[in-house]
Amino acid sequence: MVKINGEDVDAAGVVLGKYLDDNGYNRLTIAVERNYEIVTKDKYDDVTIEDGDVIDVVSFVGGG
């Protein structure tokens, strides 16, 4: 089991980029932290989510 944004998710073995795409995240407007380390955008398709990972996806919102 994996914890993503505080929720238990069965995503072990899934490539991070695929998870983000499948769940509607816009890669241009998010930052991803995996096990307390930032994952750079160029690595999203190289990282496989592993059992026990803790992932936070943060979206940037503009406004004025």
What are the functions of these language-model segments?
Residues M1-G63:
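Ubiquitin-like/PB1-type beta-grasp interaction modules and other compact soluble beta-rich domains
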